[in-house]
């Protein structure tokens, strides 16, 4: 099944809800970055959370999320847009612990760390950026997105993200949900939401069992009849890197640096952090870039 995200209204229009299956997308990220179990779970959770923030944006806006904890994984970066295109990378892809956490799951908190920052940069188009930042309060990532939304954007939310990793480090299931309270929600509605959230199985297990974004939202809302589906968006790992973009980046280094690449290295190779695609530049190509540089 191809990955996709569903947006809906629930609780008599008092909550905006999102759910996504991201299994194939996170499989692609794992394959490109050769991530081990804990790094895979952390990257997959971050990418899925970023996907939800991207889905909140307007047509031409983009979101970049950076989670910088004090754990061995190091910084995790993901970006997404309103079209469901997502990419991401983790600084240390090879983190695996033989011991599980107290809940019997991969110890993502230990990998990410419990001290650090979650930063969100919104590219609003027209060269305008908005930056928000909150401390990491959990290291489990879903709770950190929840805290960011409540603190930085003043939106009471609940974010659940999960990745099920096989013993051979391949991805079995991935996805998540996000619920946001809208102004006017009554205490009764809040109580009902809390009851449904408590009864919800873990995200990765639901997806492993074949649940769809629609069926996850039905569980979240307390029934299919309580959902008003707004939009369904395909989700995929997409990177917009290109040789031309890297060429422009090399030009920005200046003539001295490019001359050094030509005379000392006799060429250059650039690798994209997000997708690991590599671009080779010959001496002749570097000479052309040298001519364009200042």
UniProtKB/Swiss-Prot annotation:
Paired cysteines (S-S): 239-241, 272-275
Compartments reported by the entry: Cytoplasm
Pfam families: HSP33
Keyword Disulfide bond: yes
Main location: cytoplasm
SUPFAM superfamilies xrefs: Hsp33 domain, HSP33 redox switch-like
Record keyword Cytoplasm present: yes
Alphabetically ordered keywords of this record: Chaperone, Cytoplasm, Disulfide bond, Redox-active center, Zinc
Origin superkingdom: Bacteria
GO molecular function: protein folding chaperone; unfolded protein binding
InterPro entries the record matches: Heat_shock_Hsp33 (IPR000397), Heat_shock_Hsp33_C (IPR016154), Heat_shock_Hsp33_N (IPR016153)
GO cellular component: cytoplasm
Xref: CDD domains: Hsp33
Coiled coil ranges: none
GO biological processes: protein refolding
Posttranslational modification: Under oxidizing conditions two disulfide bonds are formed involving the reactive cysteines. Under reducing conditions zinc is bound to the reactive cysteines and the protein is inactive.
Protein family membership: Belongs to the HSP33 family.
Function: Redox regulated molecular chaperone. Protects both thermally unfolding and oxidatively damaged proteins from irreversible aggregation. Plays an important role in the bacterial defense system toward oxidative stress.
Name of the protein in question: 33 kDa chaperonin
């Amino acid at each position: 099944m191809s990955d996709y995200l569903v947006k809906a209204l629930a609780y008599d229009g008092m909550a905006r809800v999102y759910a996504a299956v991201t299994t194939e997308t996170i499989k692609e990220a794992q394959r490109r970055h050769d991530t081990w179990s804990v790094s895979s779970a952390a990257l997959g959770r971050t990418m899925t959370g970023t996907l939800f923030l991207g889905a909140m944006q307007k047509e031409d806006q983009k979101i970049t999320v950076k989670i910088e904890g004090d754990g061995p994984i190091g910084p995790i970066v993901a970006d997404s847009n309103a079209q469901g295109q997502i990419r991401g990378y983790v600084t240390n892809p090879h983190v695996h612990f033989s011991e599980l956490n107290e809940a019997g799951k991969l110890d993502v908190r230990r990998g990410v760390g419990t001290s650090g920052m979650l930063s969100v940069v919104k590219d609003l188009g027209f060269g305008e950026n908005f930056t928000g930042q909150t401390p990491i309060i959990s290291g489990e990532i879903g709770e950190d997105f929840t805290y960011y939304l409540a603190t930085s954007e003043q939106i009471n939310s609940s974010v659940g993200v999960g990745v099920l990793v096989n013993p051979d480090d391949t991805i079995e299931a991935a996805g998540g949900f996000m619920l946001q309270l809208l102004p006017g929600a009554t205490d009764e509605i809040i109580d009902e939401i809390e009851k449904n959230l408590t009864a919800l199985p873990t995200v990765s297990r639901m997806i492993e069992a074949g649940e769809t974004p629609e069926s996850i939202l039905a569980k979240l809302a307390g029934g299919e009849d309580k959902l008003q589906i707004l939009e369904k968006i395909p989700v995929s790992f997409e990177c917009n890197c290109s040789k031309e973009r890297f060429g422009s980046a090399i030009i920005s280094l200046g003539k001295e640096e490019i001359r050094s690449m030509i005379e000392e290295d006799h060429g250059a190779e650039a690798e994209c952090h997000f997708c690991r695609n590599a671009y080779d530049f010959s001496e002749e190509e570097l000479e052309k870039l040298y001519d364009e540089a200042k």
